[in-house]
Amino acid sequence: MKIIMLGAPGAGKGTQAKKIAAKYAIPHISTGDIFRANIKNNTELGQKAKTYMDKGELVPDELVVDLIMDRFKEADCANGYVLDGFPRTIPQAEALDKALSANGESVDYAINVEVPDENIINRMSGRRACVGCGATYHIQFNPTKVEGICDACGEKLILRDDDKPETVKNRLSVYHEQTQPLIEYYSGKGVLKEVDGTQPMDDVFAAIVKILG
């Protein structure tokens, strides 16, 4: 079972990917983790990726696909995997398909966790982080006992730059421009499945399990 997770930043696709991985005993693979592991282990591909990252440049698609295909060869991927954070663009999706088809494989499901922009802006701009211990809260869904003060250590809470409404809007516009076309791409291949991400987390997961069987 080869699964790709799609959805805007803040849609909750990472959380769902972890839940899928646990239920179906397949690895949750994120490109960030692959980069970190290869750089830490000083692999040839990791060294190549690091030269781009050190310059603040994007790692080329071909290299990312090489890193991912390398990860797929590991024993824990024998029954499939959940890929999170890749592909983000049509060229990346095409490169991944080409690499998979060379092994006689293809993507089984592309699951799109759908959440309207306004919900995502509310979700993310309501997040708060503790300056002391790093604990995270949400003013609506997971508030602290005393407003603006961490339950765990008593330090004050802040709104991180990443979660400010303007930053979230910018990230969403990049998503719509670059990643949204993937929805049509995978729909054309007959593997797209959409779930309503505005539901409670467990209901979203139940909908995904219904799709995967």
Swiss-Prot record:
It is an enzyme of class 2 (transferase). It is found in: Cytoplasm. The keyword Magnesium does not apply. Residues 30-59 are annotated as: NMP. It comes from the Bacteria. It catalyses: AMP + ATP = 2 ADP. GO terms for biological process: AMP salvage. ATP binds at residues 10-15, 127, 136-137, 199. Coiled coil: none annotated. Its main location: cytoplasm. Residues 126-163 are annotated as: LID. SUPFAM superfamilies: P-loop containing nucleoside triphosphate hydrolases. AMP binds at residues 31, 36, 57-59, 85-88, 92, 160, 171. Its EC number is 2.7.4.3. Catalyzes the reversible transfer of the terminal phosphate group between ATP and AMP. Plays an important role in cellular energy homeostasis and in adenine nucleotide metabolism. Consists of three domains, a large central CORE domain and two small peripheral domains, NMPbind and LID, which undergo movements during catalysis. The LID domain closes over the site of phosphoryl transfer upon ATP binding. Assembling and dissambling the active center during each catalytic cycle provides an effective means to prevent ATP hydrolysis. Some bacteria have evolved a zinc-coordinating structure that stabilizes the LID domain. This is Adenylate kinase. It comes from Lachnospira eligens (strain ATCC 27750 / DSM 3376 / VPI C15-48 / C15-B4) (Eubacterium eligens).
